[in-house]
Amino acid sequence: MSAPIAEAVLRYAGLGVAPFHTPGHKGGRGAHPLLRRFLTDEGLAADVSLSAELDDLHAPTGCIRAAEDLAAEAYGADAAYFMVNGTTGAVHTMLMAALSPGDTLLVPRNAHRSIVGAMILAGVRPVYLQPEVDQRLGVAMGVSLETVRRAAEAHPEARAALLVYPTYYGVATELGEIATFLHGRGMLLLTDAAHGAHFAFSDALPPSAMAAGADLSAESTHKLLGSLTQTSMLLARGGRVAAERIRAAAGILQTTSPNELLLASLDLARAQMAEEGRTRLAAVIPLAEELRRRVGEIDGLWTLGAEHMGLPGMAALDATKLTVQVMGLGMTGFAAEGVLRQRDIACELADARNVLLLLSYADGAREIEHLFAALRALAQEHPPRCTARGEGTSFCTLPPLPQTVPSPREAYFAQHECVPIGDAAGRTAAETIVFYPPGIPVLAPGDAIDTETVAYLRTMRRIGARVVGAADATLETLTVIRDL
């Protein structure tokens, strides 16, 4: 299977050319010994930056263009754009290319913090959508077709909808039906498919965003496939957003010195999945489903499965995501995460009720047995406090949708001040406050702060959630727009 970027980089590195160009470590000979240990001599020799010989990410005509074309073919897209600033960069590029300042965007409240940043950059005005909430898990799921329909009819000025597909927990909404509805109104469908880059390579997974009809889709190739961390792709289909706009926006937002190792890893990840992705996913998915069944039989634990799908906003589930509720053990997900780490298991995410564990094409029976043994030991060490599975008293209730008066951009650039959290209700937020993971904003610039949100912030802080984005990480104070 051809990998044009990787082949071009290795070809140049093997020429033995004296490098009187960047980077300064000169093919690795000047690198720190530990860096040489991390990347090896061969890897450092491949860290080159000759756009004249190795193509230019911002105006590709050679190996990068060939690799992007192969990626588009593999994903069923019209075009693919390689991103070295992660899916955050892809999301920013997507909004900058598709929308203009003042445009209205339908966006779920459980969108990633990168979307708030993109709205600030693009000057977009959000209409927030309430996602469906699974009461068993206490977390937001997908946005239903009916919710999108109501919002679009209430806001006929909306130019696009940006949906999370799938959610962090692997839940996919009825995206194909939503695409048909939006396109019928002349609207764009944009997707944050950070956790759906593998969907294109298995019929046992939900349809890919491209197959479902998305116009643009930001996909984290590194999250569940084989490229290096911080590499992603922006996929386009249908021609509703001009290619030159996408390339121009990417040129503004991405570095002019992209690392060839990162680009080559995207190229190789695509080649690997195009050649053997279906076979490897076909091997791990049954293992994941069997693991889910076995864990669900452990007293005190409950797992989200395909049998719980079929509701609005919850059309299908990614089998490679294992959500385990630990409330039956009388503990939070944060506490369970710590216990599992002591058994050499690192979780992807913990929240008030659950831990989330990701499986990928790289996992096999040995890794899965290790995980099962750790979960079984967790339950044995913490006897069940209740017999009900998937039920129980909520640790905290998600706050209601905020009112947004100034746009995120207007709020970001307004005059700010810090106030005690007890005095924040009735003020307008000027910062993004996120509990991470999953990176979903509780407050974003422009949000009206109410008492429910203040209570939620205090509760999440008390139970050990990690705060990101706040000027005061203790949440004793909040940054708000200064009253004039």
Where do the language-model regions lie?
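Conserved C-terminal alpha-helix-loop-beta "cap" of PLP-dependent enzymes
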Residues: E290-A470
